[in-house]
């Protein structure tokens, strides 16, 4: 699978099928600090991403 980290524009490739929570753990990211997007949809921590899919991981930015 192809993972694009934004806003860094860094790309990471992983082989096989992985649960989103496991992907975030492997990348050292905390679930509450990022959004995982497949196509036009948000993907939750419990969902799987297949080897032939691409996802984006975007930092969550909040302001007050």
Please place each PLM-identified region on the residue numbering:
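Ubiquitin-like/PB1-type beta-grasp interaction modules and other compact soluble beta-rich domains
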Residues: 1-63
